[in-house]
Amino acid sequence: MLGVLLVLIWSGSGSALGQINPDESSEETPSNPTEEIPASESEPEEPVSPSEKEPKRRVFKRIGPQPMTPEQREEAERLRKVAAKYGTDPTAIVGRVQLTSQYLDLTPHANATLSTVRVDLPFRSDYLLRMDVPFLRTTDAQNPGMGSQRGLSDFAVTAAWRAYNTPEYALLIGAVSTFPTASEPALGFGKYTVGPAIATARFLPRLESFLIGLLQYQTSVGGDPSRKDVSFFSVTAQVNSFWAQRWWTIVQSVWHVDFERSGKSSMVMEFEGGRNLIGRFGAYIRPGVGIYGRDVTGAYIWNIEVGVRYMFTSF
């Protein structure tokens, strides 16, 4: 059941590590017509197509922060405020009280239900403290002697700092720690874990959406020596869009690598649809499906999550 525990850990305090400015177009130096050219070099060279000239430079132009018009910057700032109000921007420094419940179909014989209370406390507009209190129930039909186990899982704390913030691009850096507070051995790692987390959000003017990246590494640093060590890396890529007056959607893929299992990996795809109900109250539903690697950490056959949240401003 260790795969279930990955959903307890915040997968991004906040995915590019810095801002890449668009490259200026280079001017080619014209050849001197009076310069003598040896006969062996007099054959004209084949022209280089624009698509082959500077492919790497064009890639960086597309993935890095782009220059925007004043109207686009104004729209980016407006949508950043909307995303913060709805609780969908992982780089926003806003308060949160959130309740979620998730059902995971892990294998043909095992499933789990995870309920989490999350509280975010913002400080001085650039700092955030997050606390997650999870409750887990697991069932494994192939191990009837264990039966169904339920209770408190591992408590998680995240401390984060927003290192960069503009209307079109933001970067959050944090550290995530978990503590072996599980009421039953099967409900937690049995280890203290710690690791860095990074979150970025970039405005996409053409889509009027945000491209969000989350990266996290987690490793065990102590705890029960008889329990298996923890060492995994996760990457999340998502597109956050807004519709009509109060609706939002998120399409995301999550890739996990478990280094304690020789680097085996898994991937899931999830879709979230949510609505702002009234004021700063919102609700969402998020189904997901496993793509590959169902027998490794962080994987499932399918899942569905529902949640409600209340967002509040910084202190």
Each language-model region and where it sits:
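Sec/Tat signal peptide C-region and signal peptidase I cleavage site
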Residues: 13-18
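Transmembrane beta-barrel domains of Gram-negative outer membranes and organellar outer membranes
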Residues: 20-315
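Bacterial N-terminal signal peptides
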Residues: 2-12
